[in-house]
UniProtKB/Swiss-Prot annotation:
This is Translation initiation factor IF-1. NCBIfam families: infA (TIGR00008). Belongs to the IF-1 family. It comes from the Bacteria. It comes from Chlorobium phaeobacteroides (strain DSM 266 / SMG 266 / 2430). Component of the 30S ribosomal translation pre-initiation complex which assembles on the 30S ribosome in the order IF-2 and IF-3, IF-1 and N-formylmethionyl-tRNA(fMet); mRNA recruitment can occur at any time during PIC assembly.
Amino acid sequence: MAKEEAIEIEGVILDALPNAQFKVKLENGLEVLAHVSGKIRMHYIRILAGDKVKVQISPYDITKGRITYRYK
């Protein structure tokens, strides 16, 4: 059984929560809870409220996601 591909969508950080988690408002209006990917964490990239980010969302649970890129 093949693994479903993750959905990539852009959004804006609304709020920074404890434990490196963020509330993100996506382009389509949904709000998801997203955590920071390992590469962003490894390179100490700071993410603040108002930043535009790219989020990967699993098709199985669209309420949670992973932040994979912060736009400049």
